């Protein structure tokens, strides 16, 4: 057990169970789930022994955007006190983590409740509910239960709307359930949850005899008045409003679409629209033309169906508004079909609704100087957590209140008769404050639930309340497969522009933790592919895991290619929303490349032809080779080498990923030249004779006095050029991740289906996987670095443009409305006409190749000439690089072999110019390499004299170049 020492800043323990530690007045117990950047633990108050959920967020690998997300969540939760909203009880901080103490909900989330509805009658918490209100044939939940949950959801949403808050991620996984108040009073529960407020477990509406619903996870919530519009991509795809899928501005009505999808799922048992990607999802919504269909045998009432149809209007203008929703008959009228015992038990907010029904000693209210986040504490209902026999893994935790998969019981406390407490004051204690902000903890993955029928049967054997051991195993397996496909086919939680960074880190973490990559992948001769699949089914949840930023995006990955899925799912990296985290398959890639208008709110005026002269001032840039150690020659791709024909599919994938990463490294090096001229030199940093810094990084916030003597116009020029180059580098890095992700999904799919055409040994898989993992980890590190620097440069550009004369074309007052692609961003960035990454790269490659040709003719620095040629080729290949993977095999087949890396945005005539230049440089490179080979064989041969050069090498951090 962790130390009972209570401190403001919890200290990690070194005992055997590293998850146990002191968090203020709470003891953090075992892990019950893991999400993106956050691990959820069960916790207990060290004095009252009441239970909480502690979300521990790792701060070490989080970017600024995600930290703002978590800070926003904490800030919002501080001011929310409502029975149907999960409360933030306390907040504690260490140097590496921030710990959020949340209310504990024992019944899991609504998605699990619906999914396992056929076994609810066998659990003591829901046995009485099913006896009174059995689930209908042809439907999901009994309409009484549906209306009960909807009333409570509407109560919480009205509370949010009164405060101009929009949740932006309403979905069954974020709707948590607690045992009914009557189950507490009957002494059924054995775990006592800690109350966030006096009425935390007293429903504001609905029935006392049914489970209580709470909204959780406010990582995407924001203040949005009724007349305001937003444009950030947030929410879960299956429950996302079509206006968000279309990248249009939206208002609070987006939440009402999500409510409609949740209501439909409660009635039917599945979401109204399902697809393998966002584009297909939007297509199906549009194709439906607001004609919401219900299964013929579904017994839902006309009122419920009409409400769903009014909520699921594609056009937000036609969609029901909040006022009409809150005043609808389904919300305001009594629930029909109640049994006599439940008639007249509709609950309203009051002070006598204590779930325990007994007086609990309250701790004195702490003074303002007490530990941050100190709150009034009381014992509450003795509550057990529900486990579902079909699940083969731990219960999916949700923000703040996930139960563990094994009920925790306290002896001697189960059957104690409760009593009723006195009324309490309506004054609420203050929410805890936090000193620093962490990134938004990601949602926990949806773990695989149906590896095999045998695994399901074994899981049933572990539960005394499960169905009969001999009951319909085949049917249950099919049912689980169908539901798993529904859950995982499109279970990408975070759909936000900044999410690309999360996804990159997620996939890198997945590979780093995979036992297959680490050599732990083993075959079972008896169970075959299914057994092998089970070895990578769930995430690694050890407390000693070196990488803590495991996002949902990462942990959903294995399940995304499970055999039982009925969807042709694509990896999250194949979806770029005009940004990873989707062209019609990927909108984020368009924003990352073109250059990531949505990511940086950046607009572009029409680019000039890349063959024209650039406006970049003379810059010192020294070419460098990528992958110098492991590459036998410096020949670029497409050189006709016969060895390519002998490479198997995995080796080809490795080569493509490494080459794409290499091109990104070349572009990054060029961007660094621009970037370093914008960064002031630290006093302790040595300089070269030209006075230029040799540091690979070390930037800090801009100020008027830190421009190093540059004019305002020069600052704007450098910022624009650095920004477009960084964005180009990001697009190439993202593509590397896309390719690796597709390979990983393909490997998992092959293992599940047991494809006999792939005959690869475990050792070979480990070698290939390790090599890809090395590149992926490098890409992750570089992506995060470039993202931060691009944001810095963007801010620098905005600052510089504001300092320009009012009549300057680049002054913000002179930007045309149509010139900005980032109209939804808080601050738009417009780049001057002609400033494109492709043009800058072309000009630089041409300059380098010409200089190298002159040196080659004079016999000077031949090895440097080789490097210059290779770098120029790589840079031109990056110009021609397609920023999105072909969405279909037909797309790839339509391209000639030599044009598969062409960029559609480059004009055809300009493309031909680049292709000819690449061919010319390759010819010179081949001739030079032959010359170098001959010279190398001469005992006293020289590779040419080293010329004096005015080019300053671009410094790179140790290990900065892509590994092989």
UniProtKB/Swiss-Prot annotation:
What's the catalysed reaction? Answer: L-seryl-[protein] + ATP = O-phospho-L-seryl-[protein] + ADP + H(+); L-threonyl-[protein] + ATP = O-phospho-L-threonyl-[protein] + ADP + H(+)
Q: Which GO terms describe its biological process?
A: autophagy of mitochondrion; cellular response to nitrogen starvation; cellular response to potassium ion starvation; piecemeal microautophagy of the nucleus; protein localization to phagophore assembly site; protein transport; regulation of autophagy; reticulophagy
Q: Where, subcellularly, is it found?
A: Cytoplasm; Preautophagosomal structure membrane
Record-listed ATP binding positions? 32-40, 55
Xref: SMART domains: S_TKc
Q: Where is the composition biased (Polar residues)?
A: 387-403, 421-437, 537-553, 943-952
Where is region (Disordered) located? 1-22, 333-445, 458-485, 534-584, 685-707, 939-964
Primary location = cytoplasm
Signal peptide location in the record?
A: none
Q: Which UniProt keywords apply?
A: ATP-binding, Autophagy, Cytoplasm, Kinase, Membrane, Nucleotide-binding, Protein transport, Serine/threonine-protein kinase, Transferase, Transport
* Highest taxon of source: Eukaryota
The family database entries (InterPro entries) matched by this protein are listed as:
Atg1-like (IPR045269), ATG1-like_MIT2 (IPR048941), Atg1-like_tMIT (IPR022708), Kinase-like_dom_sf (IPR011009), Prot_kinase_dom (IPR000719), Protein_kinase_ATP_BS (IPR017441), Ser/Thr_kinase_AS (IPR008271)
Catalytic residues?
Answer: 169
Show the PROSITE patterns listed in the entry: PROTEIN_KINASE_ATP, PROTEIN_KINASE_DOM, PROTEIN_KINASE_ST
Q: Does the keyword Zinc apply?
A: no
Which residues lie in Basic and acidic residues bias regions? 374-385, 469-485, 561-577
Record keywords: Cytoplasm included?
yes
Q: Name one GO molecular function term.
A: ATP binding
Where in the numbering of this chain does the Protein kinase domain appear? Answer: 26-331
Classification via Pfam families? ATG1-like_MIT1, ATG1-like_MIT2, Pkinase
The record's section on PANTHER family has: NON-SPECIFIC SERINE_THREONINE PROTEIN KINASE, SERINE/THREONINE-PROTEIN KINASE UNC-51-RELATED
Q: What does this protein do?
A: Serine/threonine protein kinase involved in the cytoplasm to vacuole transport (Cvt) and found to be essential in autophagy, where it is required for the formation of autophagosomes. Involved in the clearance of protein aggregates which cannot be efficiently cleared by the proteasome. Required for selective autophagic degradation of the nucleus (nucleophagy) as well as for mitophagy which contributes to regulate mitochondrial quantity and quality by eliminating the mitochondria to a basal level to fulfill cellular energy requirements and preventing excess ROS production.
User: What is its quaternary makeup?
Assistant: Homodimer. Forms a ternary complex with ATG13 and ATG17.
The family this protein is said to belong to: Belongs to the protein kinase superfamily. Ser/Thr protein kinase family. APG1/unc-51/ULK1 subfamily.
Q: What is this protein called?
A: Serine/threonine-protein kinase atg1
């Amino acid at each position: 057990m962790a130390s009972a020492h209570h401190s403001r800043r919890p200290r990690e323990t070194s005992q055997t169970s590293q998850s146990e530690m002191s968090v203020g007045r709470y003891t953090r117990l075992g892990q019950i789930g893991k999400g993106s950047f956050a691990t959820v633990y069960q916790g207990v108050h060290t004095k009252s022994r009441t239970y909480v959920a502690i979300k521990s967020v790792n701060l070490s690998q989080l970017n600024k955007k995600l930290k703002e997300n978590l800070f926003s969540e904490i800030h919002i939760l501080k001011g929310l006190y409502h029975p149907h909203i999960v409360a933030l009880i306390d907040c504690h901080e260490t140097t590496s983590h921030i710990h959020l103490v949340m209310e504990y909900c024992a019944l899991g989330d609504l998605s699990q409740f619906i999914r396992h509805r056929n076994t609810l009658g066998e659990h003591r918490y829901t046995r009485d509910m099913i006896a009174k209100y059995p689930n209908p044939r042809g439907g999901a939940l009994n309409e009484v239960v549906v209306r009960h949950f909807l009333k409570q959801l509407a109560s919480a949403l009205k509370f949010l709307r009164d405060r101009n808050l929009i949740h932006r991620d309403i979905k069954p996984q974020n709707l948590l359930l607690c045992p009914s108040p009557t189950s507490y009073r009957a002494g059924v529960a054995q775990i006592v949850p800690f109350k966030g407020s006096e009425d935390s477990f007293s429903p504001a509406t609905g029935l006392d005899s049914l489970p209580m619903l709470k909204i959780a996870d406010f990582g995407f919530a924001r203040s949005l008045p009724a007349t305001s519009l937003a444009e950030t991509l947030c929410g879960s795809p299956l429950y996302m409003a079509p206006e968000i899928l279309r990248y249009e501005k939206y208002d609070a009505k987006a939440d009402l679409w999500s409510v409609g999808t949740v209501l439909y799922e409660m009635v039917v048992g599945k979401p109204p629209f399902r697809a393998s990607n966002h584009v297909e999802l939007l297509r199906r919504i549009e194709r439906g033309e607001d004609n919401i269909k219900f299964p013929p045998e579904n017994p839902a009432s006309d009122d419920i169906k009409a409400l769903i149809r009014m909520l699921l209007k594609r056009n937000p203008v036609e969609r029901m508004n909040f006022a009409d929703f809150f005043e609808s008959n389904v919300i305001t009228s009594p629930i029909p079909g109640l049994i006599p015992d439940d008639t007249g038990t509709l609950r309203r907010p009051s002070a006598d609704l204590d779930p325990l029904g007994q007086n609990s000693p309250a701790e004195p209210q702490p003074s303002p100087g007490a530990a941050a986040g100190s709150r009034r504490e009381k014992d509450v209902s003795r509550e057990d957590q529900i486990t579902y026999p079909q699940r083969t893994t731990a219960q999916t935790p949700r923000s703040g209140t996930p139960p563990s998969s094994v009920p925790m019981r306290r002896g001697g406390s189960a059957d104690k008769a409760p009593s009723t407490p006195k009324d309490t004051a309506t004054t609420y204690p203050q929410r805890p404050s936090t000193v620093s902000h962490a990134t938004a903890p990601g949602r926990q993955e949806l773990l695989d639930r149906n590896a095999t029928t045998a695994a399901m049967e074994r899981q049933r054997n572990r539960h005394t309340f499960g169905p009969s051991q001999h009951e319909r195993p085949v049917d249950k397996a099919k049912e689980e497969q169908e539901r798993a496909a529904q859950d995982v086919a499109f279970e990408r939680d975070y759909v936000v522009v900044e999410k690309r960074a999360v996804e990159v880190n997620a996939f890198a973490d997945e590979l780093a933790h995979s036992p297959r990559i680490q050599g732990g992948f083993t075959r079972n001769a008896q169970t075959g592919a299914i057994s092998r699949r089970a070895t990578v089914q769930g995430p690694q949840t050890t407390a000693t895991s070196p990488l803590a930023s495991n996002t949902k995006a990462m942990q959903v990955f294995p399940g995304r290619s499970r055999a039982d899925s009925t969807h042709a799912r694509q990896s999250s990296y194949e979806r770029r929303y005009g940004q990873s985290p989707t062209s019609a398959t990927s909108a984020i890639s368009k924003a990352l490349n073109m250059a990531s208008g949505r990511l940086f709110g950046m607009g572009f005026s029409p680019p000039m032809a890349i063959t024209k002269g650039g406006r970049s001032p003379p810059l010192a840039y020294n070419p460098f080779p990528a992958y110098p150690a492991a590459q036998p020659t410096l020949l670029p791709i497409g050189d006709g080498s016969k060895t390519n024909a002998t490479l198997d599919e995995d080796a080809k994938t490795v080569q493509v990923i490494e080459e794409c990463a290499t091109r990104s490294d070349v572009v990054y090096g060029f961007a660094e030249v621009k970037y370093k001229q914008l960064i002031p030199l630290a006093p302790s940093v040595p300089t070269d004779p030209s006075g230029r810094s040799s540091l690979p990084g070390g930037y800090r916030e801009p100020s008027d006095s830190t421009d190093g003597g540059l004019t305002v116009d020069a600052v704007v020029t450098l910022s624009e050029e650095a920004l477009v180059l960084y964005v180009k580098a990001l697009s190439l890095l993202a593509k590397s991740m896309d390719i690796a992700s597709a390979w990983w999904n393909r490997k998992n799919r092959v293992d599940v289906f047991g494809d006999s055409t792939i005959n690869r040994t475990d050792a070979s898989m480990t070698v290939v996987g390790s090599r890809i993992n090395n590149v992926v980890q490098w890409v992750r590190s570089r992506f995060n670095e470039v993202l931060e620097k691009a944001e810095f440069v963007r801010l620098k550009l905005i600052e510089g443009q504001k300092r320009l004369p009012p009549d300057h074309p680049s002054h913000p007052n002179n930007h045309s409305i149509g010139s900005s692609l980032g109209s939804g961003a808080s601050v738009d960035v417009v780049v001057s006409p002609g400033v494109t990454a492709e043009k800058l790269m072309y000009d630089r490659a041409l300059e380098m190749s010409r200089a190298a040709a002159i040196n080659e003719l004079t016999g000077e620095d031949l090895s440097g000439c080789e490097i210059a040629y290779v770098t120029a080729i790589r840079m031109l290949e990056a110009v021609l690089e397609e920023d999105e993977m072909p969405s279909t095999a037909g797309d790839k087949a339509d391209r000639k072999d030599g044009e598969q890396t062409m960029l559609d945005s480059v004009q055809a005539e300009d493309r031909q110019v680049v292709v000819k230049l690449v061919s010319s440089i390759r010819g010179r490179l081949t001739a030079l390499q032959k010359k170098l080979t001959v010279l190398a064989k001469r005992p006293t041969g020289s590779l040419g004299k080293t010329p004096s050069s005015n080019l300053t090498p671009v410094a790179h951090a140790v290990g900065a170049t892509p590994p092989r």
